[in-house]
A protein has these predicted regions:
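Active-site-proximal specificity loops/subdomain of glycosyltransferases
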Residues: 12-13, 70-113, 121-127
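An acidic- and aromatic-residue-enriched active-site/binding cleft used to recognize and process polar
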Residues: 39-41, 65-68, 78-80, 86-89, ...
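A structural signal for isolated positions on well-ordered beta-strands in alpha/beta enzyme cores
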Residues: 33-35, 60-61, 82
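Catalytic-site signature of metal-activated, phosphate-bearing donor transferases
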Residues: 2-8, 124-377
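Short, acidic, metal-binding catalytic loop of nucleotide-sugar glycosyltransferases
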Residues: 50-59
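Short beta-strand/loop segment that forms part of the nucleotide-sugar
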Residues: 58-66
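Short acidic/polar active-site loop segments enriched in Thr and Asp
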Residues: 58, 109, 143
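N-proximal low-complexity "stem/linker" segments adjacent to membrane-targeting elements
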Residues: 1-50
Length: 377
């Protein structure tokens, strides 16, 4: 009895996407490429593309997951965009789609993985192109950039938001939480299964608005430990022993924190290596790889005109984590958000990179002459 031939990359691509066209893309041989998964994003795509083109992205590979709002027609004919249509379930294939595309087209290339409601910014933005950033990363041997996700929102009720395609997202949602974050290890088995990064960001507007349940009240000891060891400005552990000590120390305070804690960070810019495996989203990867001490940020624009319809859509499709668990939280608070909005007295207005640097949501800077970076202290 003859042995079956090993599964080829092309056949895996065809199976994952449901089309053999995915193996025939024309992707430039240089520059940073964006790999984007999208569903019904016609509202955001015009400005999203404008922003990332201004950064210097050379090409966009966009997986259109059966959009029905004109997204595909909007993207048609753009020379720097390759669209892969698929109706396969997002929840079952999101990691595989990204990984297979990189294995096929982007080995040892810099790849960015933004959602369409995310704007990537970094030290030196908007003056410095993304090529300066990847030059720094290459020169210093780093293979990934860590980025907090910063939820952006309007200064009033969501019912008053009026956004039009092509307008800057920041015109509609210029506010964010400048405090209330922590930099901590993951709980449970994910900490062992996904080694990069060593810590993740939690907190911010999402936790303030939606996550208040904890196993016990916090104490002054909890506050001291969190402020001293797990603030945004605390260092990442760099050794196996450091990670273990980090885990044991965090166990002292974890029961005083919300049981449901959304990860508010990603590693969206990666020099792709063979076999890399995502943790579902772009929050972490299984392999331990060198991550730069410099941080960028992903400005996250969920609260536009379509927020309510997007939540209803997500609840109906159930394609997101935990059967759209986060969207159930949004839905439970919808009336209050539409009436009052996420803004509160501690909100900070985004006026440029200094807004993020000053509160620890971005680290470092790019030097103009040598294309290298130094750590902000």
């Amino acid at each position: 009895m003859s042995q079956a031939l090993p599964e080829t990359l092309e056949s895996r691509l065809t199976e994952a996407f449901g089309t053999d066209a995915v193996g025939k893309l024309s992707v430039p041989g240089s520059g940073v490429v964006a790999v984007v998964l999208a569903y019904n994003e016609a509202l955001r795509f015009p400005y999203f593309l404008e922003h990332y083109r201004a950064l210097g992205i050379s090409h966009f590979i966009i997986v259109d997951n059966a959009s029905s709002d004109g997204t595909r027609a909007l993207l048609k004919g753009m020379a720097d965009v390759s669209v892969i249509p698929t109706d396969k379930p997002y929840r079952d294939h999101k990691s595989e789609w990204r990984q297979l595309l990189c294995e096929r087209y982007l080995q040892e290339r810099w790849v960015i993985f933004p959602d369409v409601d995310e704007l990537f910014v970094y030290p030196g933005w908007p003056e410095r192109p993304i090529g300066d950033l990847t030059d720094y990363l290459d020169t210093n041997g780093y293979r990934a950039l860590f980025c907090p996700m910063v939820d952006m929102y309007p200064g009033g009720p969501l019912k008053n938001v009026s956004y039009r395609p092509g307008q800057s997202f920041l015109d509609a949602c210029p506010w964010f939480d400048g405090s209330g974050y922590r930099l901590a290890p993951l709980k449970g088995s994910h900490r062992k299964r996904y080694k990069t990064p060593a810590r993740h960001v939690f907190g911010g507007a999402r936790e303030r608005l939606f996550h208040h349940n904890s196993k016990r009240p916090g104490t002054w000891v909890d506050n001291f430990v969190l402020k001293t060891f797990f603030s945004l400005k605390s260092p990442m552990p760099k050794t196996r022993f450091g990670r273990l000590a980090d885990h044991l120390l965090f166990k002292l305070v974890k029961n005083a924190l919300p049981d449901t804690a959304a990860v508010q960070s990603k590693i969206p810019l990666i020099r792709w290596g063979s076999g890399y495996k995502f943790s579902g989203g772009v929050h972490g990867i299984a392999q331990e790889i060198p991550v730069a001490p410099v941080w960028g940020a992903l400005l996250h624009f969920k609260y536009l005109d379509d927020f309510q319809s997007k939540v209803s859509e997500a609840l109906e499709r159930r394609q997101h984590t935990d059967n759209a668990g986060h969207y159930r939280e949004y839905d439970a608070q919808m009336a209050l958000l539409m009436k009052r909005g996420p803004f509160d007295g501690g909100s900070t207005r985004f006026t440029g990179m200094e807004s993020l640097l000053s509160c620890g949501l971005v680290r470092g800077k790019l030097r103009r002459k040598h294309r290298s970076a130094t750590r902000e202290h």
